[in-house]
Regions:
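Short, charged, low-complexity loops and linkers
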Residues: 11-28
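Acidic/histidine-rich alpha-helical segments that form the ligand environment
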Residues: 27-41, 97-137, 153
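Alpha-helical initiation/capping and key positions within long helical/coiled-coil segments
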Residues: 24, 28-31, 62, 66, ...
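Generic structural signal for well-ordered secondary structure
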Residues: 22, 29, 33, 56-57, ...
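Short, contiguous alpha-helical
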Residues: 1-8, 12-14, 47-95, 126, ...
Length: 180
């Protein structure tokens, strides 16, 4: 069951990241919508969007909506770090957000949001990585995690988060392919 919940493993909070690793993470953030597009380009798309990756999980469609919600939050958190306009993350309840009714609608609006957001977000992060390296240590306190999270950790976390949910969507596609 843990392999279905964390198909690529859980995020390692204790890892230190080199500039090269962070550049690679930004490329993964930039490319995530393209990888999602490849998964959506299937004859089994409708079945995949309704499939769950494990019992009781979100469907692929709900995962796409969640990624849009979560990655908008992450973009804003990165902006707060870079603009020095906040010192604490504004938490949000992802499960409550998934119950607001919009997760029932087609994935397409969230997909389009992810396309634009990831383009802008990756440019923001690449620009930050070109500047003063001390910005990577700048952080926000995250009350849900009980710790401060640096910009470097946010970059790595959300590269992981995108890969994590792409793996969930791949599991949904595998499930849809096994229906026949």
């Amino acid at each position: 069951m843990e392999n279905l919940k964390y198909p690529i493993g859980s995020f390692n909070w204790d890892q230190d990241f080199s500039l090269e690793e962070l550049l690679g993470a930004v490329v993964r953030i930039q490319d995530m919508p393209n990888k999602l597009a490849k998964l959506l380009n299937t004859e089994k798309r409708d079945a995949m969007l309704k499939a769950q990756y494990r019992e009781g999980s979100w469907t692929a469609q709900e995962v796409i909506h969640h990624m849009a919600d979560s990655h908008m939050q992450a973009f804003i958190r990165c902006k707060h770090i870079l603009a020095k306009t906040a010192d604490t993350v504004q938490p949000y309840d992802e499960n409550a957000w998934s119950q607001t009714g919009d997760y029932d609608f087609s994935y397409e609006s969230s997909y389009l949001m992810l396309m634009g957001l990831h383009q802008r977000w990756s440019l923001l992060l690449l620009n930050a990585l070109k500047g003063d390296p001390s910005v990577l240590a700048a952080s926000l306190y995250h009350p849900e995690h009980g710790r401060s999270i640096s910009l470097a950790q946010f970059i790595a976390l959300y590269a992981w988060h995108g890969d994590h949910h792409l793996a969930h969507i791949q599991l949904c596609l595998n499930s849809a392919n096994n229906l026949n």
